[in-house]
Amino acid sequence: MHRTAIFLTYRSCMRNFSTLSKTLTVSSGKVIRNGPFRRVIREKNQITKAPSVKAFKENSNSGIIKVHDPIATTILNEPTVIIERQIEFMNVFLGFEQANRYAIMDVNGNKIASMMERDFSITKAIMRQFYRLHRPFLVDVFDNWGNVIMTIKRPFSFINSHIKTIIPPSAYVDNGSDSTHYHDGKEGTTVGETIQNWHLWRRRYELFQKDGVEGSTFDQFGKIDAPFLSFDFPVTDADGKIMASVDRNWVGLGREMFTDTGVYVVRFDSQRCFDNIYPTEMLSSQVLTLDQRAVLLANAVSIDFDYFSRHSRQTGGFLSFGGGYDE
């Protein structure tokens, strides 16, 4: 009888604990997991189903970014773009952390845009020396005429980086000076975000798109799960099929050893960019929307900061085989 009473009491406690856990999961309203992918909720007490991803041609006008927007006509309409981080000589020879600069090119090597980390004050320059890999930053994407067409934002990250993709409301560059001037007002429209998913040796990210301009949810449309010291970062859908990728190209022993530079190939279109790279059966039939392409472009910057820059080194001038400084 004594053992029976203890067993019944144990079952009752476990049943109450299970009920309490379900109640807390629903009421917290932070993250709802549905199968392999998830949806991040910005409103409480809201339960949603797993997101669906439509083809780019069918969904090009339904997202936040439209086909005629500058970021689309300049970069995102390209099936493949190449990002090259500019050489940072002070970082290489003195270990001084400089603001990152990038050139964006098409597959023919023509420069179509650029990216530059905001560097407006001595305070931020000092912060870069202390925070290095974990530092917060704002990276602006410019067209060839100096207009800001997108902003990549990352707050301070102690472990996992969290990148936001933002379309600015309005901005212009004063061509008569070296500084960029921004109109007062709200920060801009968030298109999506990427969240690094910490793992002891693998390189993982989750990619989200915002559910409309006024939406409060972020739907996961892809994930990256690259192996240890990988140079290739394929983006897979919910079925594990490859829909896009960010790959770091080896640029030669001399440049890798004596400069702080990096070249990345961003492939947006699974139907046009992976000939002789992956077997057809490994490719997804889904094609990234403009919003999703903008998020992937920002994720390429996150990959560069997290794994291939020298930000976690105290001194420059050393070769980074795989760049896994934070592992």
From Swiss-Prot:
GO terms for molecular function: phospholipid scramblase activity. It is found in: Mitochondrion. The keyword Oxidoreductase does not apply. The keyword RNA-binding does not apply. It comes from the Eukaryota. One of its GO terms (biological process) is negative regulation of autophagy of mitochondrion. InterPro entries: Scramblase. Keywords: Mitochondrion. One of its GO terms (cellular component) is mitochondrion. Disulfide bonds: none annotated. It holds the Pfam family Scramblase. Belongs to the phospholipid scramblase family. This is Altered inheritance rate of mitochondria protein 25. It comes from Saccharomyces cerevisiae (strain ATCC 204508 / S288c).
